[in-house]
């Protein structure tokens, strides 16, 4: 059970789960500026810059990482791993959407979209509708920030400002969603913030709303042993104290329920053809795997994709 979460908690872009979206956007911004990037997200930097001051400022700051590494030599590879992971994850799910539209799907739903800019940066075919579901304040920040820079969506983008713990299927339908049309669903950076029963309920709702031929993609986090979690917590606490950085412990926001269902197995049992790709395999394939202390196969996440039968 997460110690910082409550059943009806809310957040904006600078607090709680919302702040993690800024950290992910910072990693995408850093990747975009690499010589040979895996992704191109020209809007990530804009979204990070408008979010104010926070721990996310240091994710892509090579100078800061170098200073921290002098104090803790294992931190450098860990920060590099974190940035590489976000790049590989984004690349994987970009490819998922490309395959979906190539198959003729024109209805997209991004769950807990955060600062995801795919509705603005991907080359969607004519007639594509992208629904984004998230907390009202998060969606409002993204829309207003990008609009102030003259950024326009490349699809028919529709906001669904609602918490996924509420009746989001009704809100989605009111926004124009058509359950008779095949849909491509994405749950990226989401499941770890849901209790096990809420995850099952989410996929049951997706299944009910999905016409045959629909597709779903999801990221599920690996298992982190309690002692490893404690070591990481102590390490980052030391960094924040030593370098006067605003503390942010993501593990306090997530749920590591031991009885959480395996996503691919759940989908297979409920009418989907599912495939699971260990994230370390994808990182290795793209030459982005960084060896880190305390790393093992169980600690890596899994990328699952499925097609509705």
Curated annotation (Swiss-Prot):
Matching Pfam families, A to Z? LCM
UniProt superkingdom: Bacteria
Q: What is its EC number?
A: 2.1.1.-
Gene Ontology BP term (one): methylation
| Amino-acid positions noted as binding S-adenosyl-L-methionine in the UniProt annotation, renumbered to this chain | 134, 163-164
Protein's UniProt name: Putative S-adenosyl-L-methionine-dependent methyltransferase Mvan_0104
UniProt-listed Gene3D superfamilies: Vaccinia Virus protein VP39 (3.40.50.150)
Q: Tell me yes or no: is Cell inner membrane among this UniProt entry's keywords.
A: no
The species is Mycolicibacterium vanbaalenii (strain DSM 7251 / JCM 13017 / BCRC 16820 / KCTC 9966 / NRRL B-24157 / PYR-1) (Mycobacterium vanbaalenii)
Q: Which UniProt keywords apply?
A: Methyltransferase, S-adenosyl-L-methionine, Transferase
Leader sequence range is: none
Hey, which family's this protein in? Belongs to the UPF0677 family.
Picking any one GO molecular function of the record gives: methyltransferase activity
Q: Which InterPro entries match?
A: Ppm1/Ppm2/Tcmp (IPR007213), SAM-dependent_MTases_sf (IPR029063), SAM_mthyl_Trfase_ML2640-like (IPR011610)
Specify the enzyme's EC class, one word.
Answer: transferase
Reported function: Exhibits S-adenosyl-L-methionine-dependent methyltransferase activity.
Entry-linked SUPFAM superfamilies: S-adenosyl-L-methionine-dependent methyltransferases (SSF53335)
């Amino acid at each position: 059970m997460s110690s910082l979460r409550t059943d009806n908690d809310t957040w904006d872009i600078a607090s709680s789960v919302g702040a993690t979206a800024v950290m992910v956007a910072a990693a995408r911004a850093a990747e975009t500026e690499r010589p040979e990037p895996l992704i191109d997200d020209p809007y990530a930097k804009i979204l990070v810059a408008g979010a104010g001051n926070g721990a996310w400022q240091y994710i892509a700051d090579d100078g800061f990482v170098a200073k921290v590494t002098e104090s803790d030599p294992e931190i450098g590879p860990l920060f590099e791993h974190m940035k590489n992971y976000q790049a590989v994850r984004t690349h994987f799910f970009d490819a998922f959407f490309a395959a979906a539209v190539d198959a003729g799907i024109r209805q997209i739903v991004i769950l807990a979209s955060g600062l995801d800019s795919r509705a603005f940066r991907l080359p969607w075919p004519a007639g594509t509708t992208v629904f984004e579901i998230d907390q009202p304040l998060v969606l409002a920040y993204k829309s207003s920030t990008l609009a102030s820079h003259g950024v326009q969506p490349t699809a028919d983008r529709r906001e669904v400002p609602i918490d996924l713990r509420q009746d989001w299927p009704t809100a989605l339908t009111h926004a124009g969603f058509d359950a008779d049309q095949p849909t491509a669903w994405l749950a990226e950076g989401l499941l770890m913030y849901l209790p096990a029963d809420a995850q099952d309920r989410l996929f049951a709702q997706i299944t009910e709303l999905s016409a045959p031929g629909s597709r779903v993609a999801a990221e599920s986090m690996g298992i982190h042993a309690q002692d490893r979690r404690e070591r990481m917590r102590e390490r980052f606490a030391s960094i924040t104290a030593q370098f006067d950085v605003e503390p942010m412990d993501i593990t306090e926001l997530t749920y590591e329920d031991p009885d959480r269902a395996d996503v691919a197995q759940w989908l297979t049992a409920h009418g989907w053809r599912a495939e699971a790709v260990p994230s370390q395999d994808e990182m290795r394939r793209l030459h982005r795997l960084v060896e880190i202390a305390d790393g093992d196969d169980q600690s890596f996440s899994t990328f699952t994709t499925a097609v509705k039968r």
